[in-house]
Amino acid sequence: AAIMNGLKVAGKDMSKVKLVTSGAGAAALACVGLLVKLGIPRENVWVTDLAGVVYEGRVELMDPDKSIYAQKTDARKLGEVIDNADVFLGLSAGGVLKAEMVKRMAPNPIIFALANPTPEITPGEVKSVRDDAIIGTGRSDYPNQINNILCFPYIFRGALDAGATTITVEMEMAAVHTIAELAQ
């Protein structure tokens, strides 16, 4: 929902953006999977993790879920794939996104640095090099907190009320669209 609304504010088309994520665990891959279903082309998604860029032929720290996003590239590090990125989605570790990398992102970049307790980059670090960036973190003491607490209780309440035994992708997408609409 936050990325959908951020793209509206930035005047960007979801089908044309380049997304770079730092983190390839369950949270990151679930987010990326949903963003692809919402309209970001899979070929525009660049996933990085502790071993670097998820690329075709990589064996270190790979699994079938990551392999879906493997790119044909010689790039091996986050700093090599961040150029012209419209969206950075951080679900990894503090300090991995550097100000010099932010400088190389596309105009009006969306930077969601969600690692806790230390985000991938702080709002102050972003603002020191870009005044056109939209930044959110997972912390309540910084502006623009992004927190999954907005959706979990209500998805479960809706599932219980409907007698559902599974949370489906359709339910997740409905939650995304509803939260995006409410947060505009």
Label for each model-derived stretch:
Residues 66-134, 139-141:
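Rossmann-like adenosine-cofactor binding region
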Residues 24, 28, 71-74, 78-81, ...:
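Generic structural signal for well-ordered, non-membrane alpha-helical segments
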Residues 1-16, 113-184:
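Adenosine-phosphate binding glycine-rich loop
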Residues 21-22, 42-43, 48, 52, ...:
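Functionally constrained cores in energy, signaling, and assembly domains
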Residues 1-89:
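Glycine-rich phosphate/diphosphate-binding loop of Rossmann-like nucleotide-binding domains
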